A protein has these predicted regions:
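Short, exposed beta-strand "edge-strand" segments with a Pro/Gly-rich flavor and a Y/T-containing core
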Residues: 14-17, 41-46, 142-145, 157-159, ...
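Conserved beta-strand positions in the central sheet of alpha/beta enzyme cores
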Residues: 35, 63, 102-103, 163
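Active-site acidic/histidine proton-transfer and metal-coordination neighborhood
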Residues: 76-162
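Active-site metal-binding loops of divalent metal-dependent hydrolases
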Residues: 166
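N-terminal pre-domain/capping segments
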Residues: 1-89
Length: 167
């Protein structure tokens, strides 16, 4: 039995070119795919079928990143329900792109612990309805910002799957 192959993805953080240029660059640099925010300008320029075709032609996979609460640092006035609504809309849009995986940057570190756990329970119920793997990124200003609490959170929420932000 062969071991699974590690896939390498080029992030489009800071990328200003087109999706076609990104695919060409990633392929030339021997990446297996792209990681891109769902609201990135290079995706907004195309319909879902054009995005899928561009990736397929370049033999590139896709990881979609969905950010809620307005930006990478969330608006503190954005409620848990608003974050969940934004996640739902984002997941529905992302599914049309046929990504390999979806990463969520969601929630707020300003909520108390009871609200955090209630939010995660609702969020995990929500993502379970989708057929593509969905992970939550450990990110500053977000629900999962604190690595020291992670063992307890993973024990309490065994369905939780993480993408680690090492920055």
């Amino acid at each position: 039995m062969s071991s699974p192959r590690l896939l390498l993805f080029k992030t489009l953080w800071g990328w200003t070119g087109s999706l076609e240029q990104a695919c060409s660059s990633a392929k030339g640099e021997r990446f297996d795919g792209l990681e891109v925010n769902l609201d990135h300008p290079c995706l907004k320029a195309l319909q879902p079928e054009g995005i899928r075709r561009c990736l397929s032609d370049a033999k590139q996979h896709l990881i979609v990143e969905i950010v809620t609460g307005g930006d990478y640092t969330p608006d503190l006035n954005c409620s848990p329900s608003q974050h969940l609504d934004q996640v739902q809309r984002g997941l529905e849009r992302a599914m049309a792109l046929a990504p390999l995986k979806i990463t969520l940057i969601t929630g707020s570190d300003s909520w108390d612990e009871v609200e955090q756990h209630r939010f995660l329970d609702r969020l995990l119920d929500q993502v379970d309805a989708f057929s593509i793997p969905v992970t939550l990124e450990t990110h500053r200003s977000r629900s999962l910002f604190d690595p020291w609490r992670m063992p307890d959170w993973l024990a309490r929420h065994p369905r939780l799957r993480l993408t680690a932000d090492m920055s």
